[in-house]
């Protein structure tokens, strides 16, 4: 009777341990009770649990570090954006005041100096932008000109070659049509005049 109770208690304890392992450390091998014996001894099981617990703690710490770092970056961006928005609003309000004082003719010396400085800086920026735009436009014009000249030169060369070939062809035809025999004008070489036999031709040559 006591042996049966002891066996039942062991099964219950094993089930409780396995339940805890599956909740806390998923994937950890379960302990199996077999005739009062476990497939894994207590020492190795304790080491396995300890190792997995340490690994889980490391993962949790790493996740916490990542979360903190991400939150810090988000907060930093928010602070930077808030500061930029605040500066822009302050600058806008200041410019509106300067504009009003300028229209009313009530600019102070300090405001006048600041306004002149602002105008000068904006003028320099505009000149810089204009210069960059001008250089960019000029480069584009040069590229287009080079491309146009290249295409035009290629077309001109092809046109010249075609004209030369046509001219040469016409001259060749003309020469072939008007080749004269030096003894009988109007006849092509190798043909004797009408009425002149081969014998007469031979006697004449003698």
UniProtKB/Swiss-Prot annotation:
Residues with Phosphoserine modification: 197, 202-203
One matching Pfam family: RRT14
Subcellular location field: Nucleus, Nucleolus
Biased composition (Acidic residues): 197-206
Any Gene Ontology CC annotation: nucleolus
Region (Disordered): 178-206
Gene (name only): RRT14
Listed name of the protein: Regulator of rDNA transcription 14
Summary of the function given for this chain in its UniProt record: Involved in ribosome biogenesis, probably through modulation of rDNA transcription.
Family: Belongs to the RRT14 family.
Keyword annotations from UniProtKB, A to Z: Nucleus, Phosphoprotein, Transcription, Transcription regulation
């Amino acid at each position: 009777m006591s042996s049966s109770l002891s066996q039942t208690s062991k099964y219950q304890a094993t089930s409780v341990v396995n339940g805890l392992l599956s909740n806390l450390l998923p994937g950890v091998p379960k302990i199996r009770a077999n005739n009062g014996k476990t497939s894994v001894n207590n020492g190795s099981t304790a080491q396995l649990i300890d190792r997995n617990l340490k690994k889980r703690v490391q993962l949790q710490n790493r996740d916490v570090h990542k979360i903190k770092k991400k939150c810090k970056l988000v907060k930093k961006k928010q602070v930077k954006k808030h500061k930029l928005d605040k500066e822009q609003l302050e600058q806008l309000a200041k410019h509106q005041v300067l504009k009003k004082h300028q229209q009313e003719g009530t600019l102070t010396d300090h405001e006048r100096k600041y306004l002149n400085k602002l105008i000068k800086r904006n003028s320099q920026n505009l000149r810089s932008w204009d210069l960059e735009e001008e250089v960019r436009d000029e480069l584009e014009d040069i590229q287009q000109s080079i491309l146009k000249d290249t295409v035009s030169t290629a077309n001109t060369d092809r046109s010249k070659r075609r004209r030369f070939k046509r001219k040469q062809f016409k001259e060749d035809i003309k020469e072939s049509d008007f080749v004269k025999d030096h003894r009988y004008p109007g006849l092509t070489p190798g043909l004797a005049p009408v009425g002149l036999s081969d014998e007469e031709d031979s006697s004449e040559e003698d």
